């Protein structure tokens, strides 16, 4: 795919997919491309306010979780040689938020990222779209789409005034619908897709990108084997919209394959990819059925709880960061440097699983 414009607007949802980890991983590479003027990033004042609000929430939730862990895992203090000294620092939400804000502002206040105000957007245009059911107001929860509608209208005005198209990066289906209906907008589903597109269309990186892809194909069996090994030793968490509260008793990885690759960064010695794996696995569950159980107030226990075990086949997708090396630009030096999945705990969707007889 050819790069059609360097003008880019990234929705809050796309930043959240990357856990708002500004200055790290994919968002660090985004910042590097902006600094190199490979991307001209637009951010509306609405998105900026949303992110700052979410950073505050993330900081508070993370510190609360850390404090709970410190309390529950306090016994690890006796094994600092194994557990490390960094498990029990005394941190505050304010300190975490200040650092997160500093890194966010390094991206948006760098003299290159352009802040777009919504103050000149005509509210009548937005309300006409709302009452007519036009995107992004064409689904349920329409009122929640007002911030997105104002942001997109402001970005559209910038694109039209400069006679340019603009990439709209969002995993929000409503934003995608707006982009599809606007000749100035080109929708991309993720920041990873954007970085892959920029890297592969950069003259300085084009040959390196092609070479890195060939090295990756050479390493594909090793990558899949490593992913399978990690998943075989991983912890899985089932979830369902039903009333069941199952516990996993066993997981068997049946197959692992690579579904999608996005080139995040490449040099003469290594490359970083965002990899989506298709994973087929069989999981055995222990269920407790309380539907016909009776609560004994005196003994404070349920009687008549039914226990059963069932197995399900799952088709899941998990994303990981992959770094491969080829020192001195030689395929004979090809190696996998690291493979790190985005989450340490892997979700299993019981609602979409297939029951195994």
Please identify what each model-predicted range represents.
Residues 2-164, 173-226, 230-273, 278-280, ...:
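Active-site-proximal, substrate-binding regions of enzyme catalytic domains
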Residues 168:
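Conserved SAM-binding loop
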């Amino acid at each position: 795919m050819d790069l059609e414009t360097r003008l880019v607007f990234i929705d809050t949802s796309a930043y959240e997919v990357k856990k708002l980890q500004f200055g790290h991983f994919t968002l660090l590479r985004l910042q590097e491309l902006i600094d190199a003027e490979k991307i001209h990033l637009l951010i509306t004042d609405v998105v900026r306010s949303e992110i700052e609000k979410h950073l505050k929430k993330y900081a508070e939730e993370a510190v609360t979780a850390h404090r709970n862990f410190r309390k529950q895992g306090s016994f690890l203090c006796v094994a600092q040689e194994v557990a490390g000294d960094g498990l029990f620092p005394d941190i505050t939400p304010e300190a975490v938020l200040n650092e997160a804000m500093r890194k966010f502002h390094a991206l948006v206040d760098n003299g290159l990222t352009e802040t777009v105000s919504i103050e000149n957007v005509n509210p009548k245009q937005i309300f006409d779209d709302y009452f007519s059911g036009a995107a992004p107001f064409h689904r349920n929860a329409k009122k929640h789409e007002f911030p997105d509608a104002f942001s997109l209208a402001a970005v559209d005005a910038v694109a039209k005034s400069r006679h340019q198209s603009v990439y709209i990066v969002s995993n929000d289906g409503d934003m995608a619908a707006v982009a599809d209906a606007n000749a100035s907008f080109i929708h991309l589903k993720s920041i990873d897709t954007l970085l892959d597109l920029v890297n592969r269309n950069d003259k300085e990186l084009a040959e390196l990108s092609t070479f890195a892809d060939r090295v990756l194909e050479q390493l594909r069996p090793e990558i899949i084997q490593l992913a399978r090994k990690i998943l075989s030793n991983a912890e899985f968490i089932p979830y369902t919209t039903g009333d069941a509260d199952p516990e996993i008793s066993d997981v068997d990885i049946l197959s692992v394959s690579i579904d999608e690759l996005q080139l995040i960064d490449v040099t003469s010695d290594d490359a970083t990819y965002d990899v989506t794996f298709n994973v087929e696995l069989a999981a055995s569950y222990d269920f407790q059925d309380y539907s016909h159980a009776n609560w004994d107030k005196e003994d404070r226990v349920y009687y008549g709880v039914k226990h059963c075990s069932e197995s399900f086949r799952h088709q899941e997708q998990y994303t990981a960061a992959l770094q491969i090396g080829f020192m001195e630009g030689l395929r004979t030096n090809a190696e996998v440097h690291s493979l790190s999945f985005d989450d340490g705990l892997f979700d299993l969707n019981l609602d979409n699983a297939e029951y195994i007889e």
